[in-house]
Amino acid sequence: MSKPVIAIVGRPNVGKSTIFNRIAGERISIVEDTPGVTRDRIYTASEWLGHEFSLIDTGGIEISDAPFMEQIKQQAEIAIDEADVIIFLVSAREGVTDADERVAQILYRAEKPILLGVNKADNPEQRQDIFDFYSLGFGDPIPVSGAHGQGVGDLLDAAVAKFPTDLEEEDDDSIKFSLIGRPNVGKSSLVNAMLKEDRVIVSQIEGTTRDAIDTKFMAENNQEFTMIDTAGIRKRGKVYENTEKYAVMRALRAIDRSDVVLVVLNAEEGIREQDKKVAGYAHEAGRGIIIVVNKWDTLEKDNHTMKEFEDHIRNQFQYLDYAPIIFVSAKTGVRLQNLPAMIELVSENQNRRIQSALLNDVLMEATTVTPTPAINGKRLRIYYMTQVAVQPPTFVVFVNDINLLHFSYQRFLKNQLRKTFDFTGTPIHLIPRQRK
């Protein structure tokens, strides 16, 4: 099911990022800290009392060279386009300003629920003195303090109560995938080329609230796929469409809904920082990943070119050592016919379940070949392992002391699982648990 989206909007210096971080809390790093992954806190998954949602800080979207009010206007429009619930943030310290009133004018046309949060209400007097904000026309102001956390729960209670009840259920059997990558890597031409590869387009599904178009098609083996619409592929250019952070935000939304993510690189331009950033998000979200090098036809090649390019990718994306790499050309169609089977394989590996008996056979063999380490005379003992989840495959390993299970030995155990059960294209998570 698509998760609801909350966007925080307001003029500069009202504390949007403080509220964003307060709501997001530690969930920004919920999966793991991955070396080589650059985080951008503009967009994160969060949860309140069992309700999962995505959170956008529009203040993190900076439109370069745009006038002050034009930036605010565009940030508000992003919220109107993307969000299910909008938090309009103002400041108790400054009271109602001209800039607040201009933001309000833009938000009046939004056919979305809007909550008025009065930030920096850090003491009882400020929490009481919020009546002027009724003049903005968004109902009861909700006093909050991003610095101290007061009132944030009330704001989230109000937001959750406004979540739409008709978000599209995504429980069909099709494999959902998206193509992500910075502008000019050829996502659009790759989409069009894939849909021309002797497959039948089943339907184009209009998104309920967000202009997205998902395309279903059938592969030759009758496996159904859903191509998730991604930033900039079909949506025509508004001013902010080309800003890097906005593109990243849209890519994250696509990742959120995908089973498998195709990270598209441009063979002509090589690997850029934004490539690594977005790929890192897909990795940390636990999605299946395929690295697709497009425009392969444009390079002059010899017998070593592909191997050298692959080695360069492995060096730059060390945390994606499990992701297969395919070199394609949307223009000539080379190797595009291999993509559906590769997507299907990665999806199967994402959903692979291993019986506990087989896992413990692997564990026994692994600890025999490479005995467990000892720290300060105390040796790690591993009792057993069991799988607790899929998408991605997640395993709990029970030990005598979790402090003895060093990262390097965890990596060794993961490698043994991959060696035995493949898991091509999917991250695997290992959770140590201390047996009492």
From Swiss-Prot:
GTP 2 binds at residues 181-188, 229-233, 294-297. SUPFAM superfamilies: P-loop containing nucleoside triphosphate hydrolases. CDD domains: EngA1 (cd01894), EngA2 (cd01895). InterPro entries: G_ENGA, GTP-bd, GTPase_Der, KH_dom-like, KH_dom-like_a/b, P-loop_NTPase, Small_GTP-bd. Pfam families: KH_dom-like, MMR_HSR1. PROSITE patterns: G_ENGA. Residues 4-167, 175-351 form the EngA-type G domain. GO terms for molecular function: GTP binding; ribosome binding. The keyword Glycosyltransferase does not apply. Transmembrane segments: none annotated. NCBIfam families: GTPase_EngA, small_GTP. GTPase that plays an essential role in the late steps of ribosome biogenesis. This is GTPase Der. It comes from Latilactobacillus sakei subsp. sakei (strain 23K) (Lactobacillus sakei subsp. sakei). The gene is der.
